[in-house]
């Protein structure tokens, strides 16, 4: 039994794909969802982050247990739209694929949750407990929306949290964190013909970077035991097992220098230069360790000339890989997809769970699971398979019913 026809389910997704939320303007999706939920007499609210950014919260049922279902409303920039085969902000159905920015990451997953929630309410299928929908702003960058919801206590009483990021047949119980670390060197600018009376900031920065590479290589050499196992994820992505060495490397801490800036013109000694790193913390080497790691190198080089800024700081998240939520999703999904394709793994990326759970993470069943091929995220001509989008609505409904009944 369904409340919406297949055509209506696709149109609902089309409606929010048309709302351009490239790292902003989630308020438009919130207003759309508010009107939709009001139509079905479902209690909901909009919580503003700022004038244009907001979260949306809706709830059905009452009492315990409480299952939170979450998805983010922002999408990444579409880039040069001339490079797209189909308009990025207009849903296009072609060869059983639904094209558009955010179809995979992750308006497809979000709308699947929305439809599941409405149909559960309309069909009076909720056996007991509460389902709380948390649609967030700003996941792609600073997780402002998730932080606001956590600060206001929307996760304090939940028993389970499912985030419908695009995972295909993967079910994730944990993931790495993510940190942006910017190291800035300062010097003294002079004309390049008299460099000896100046102080080249690039030289100081290179000294830092050389020491960083040396210390990082030492750390990775000893980084051999990990709580997180990401090997099943990579096996799914590349279609074969990865070597033990590669699995060990991928499951541990990683740090990449991704941006370098220094100097403004060739005939001036630069007085400022910077390096920016993306670091993926793990339980063994967490965010506090990373900050100390960078600061110790800075102190060793010259703390008067070097400074550290951490504009983005999301912690790794762990949970029980055999939790009731994980096993329930695995059991339900096996009726819709090939059982041999289903796997449970840790994830190398980060999600809103970093901001949602905080100190409460040990008490919450976590599952990251949703429709879409993760390799399609952020791509030109992004699409979600129509059949997968529709199937996951039913998976979400059945898994929610079973989890709340048996938790």
Swiss-Prot record:
Q: Species lineage, top-down? A: Bacteria, Bacillati, Bacillota, Bacilli, Bacillales
Q: Which reaction does it catalyse?
A: N-succinyl-(2S,6S)-2,6-diaminopimelate + H2O = (2S,6S)-2,6-diaminopimelate + succinate
Q: Which InterPro entries match?
A: ArgE/DapE, ArgE/DapE_CS, Bact_exopeptidase_dim_dom, Peptidase_M20, Peptidase_M20_dimer, Peptidase_M20A
* Species in which this protein is naturally found: Staphylococcus aureus (strain MRSA252)
Similarity-based family: Belongs to the peptidase M20A family.
Q: What is this protein called?
A: Probable succinyl-diaminopimelate desuccinylase
The entry's Zn(2+) 1-binding residues are 72, 105, 165
Report if keyword Lipid biosynthesis is assigned. Answer: no
Task: Name the NCBIfam families for this protein.
Answer: DapE-ArgE (TIGR01910), PRK08588.1 (NF006365)
Q: Which GO terms describe its biological process?
A: diaminopimelate biosynthetic process; lysine biosynthetic process via diaminopimelate
Which EC numbers characterise this protein's activity in its record?
A: 3.5.1.18
Asked if DNA-binding is a keyword of the record, the answer is: no
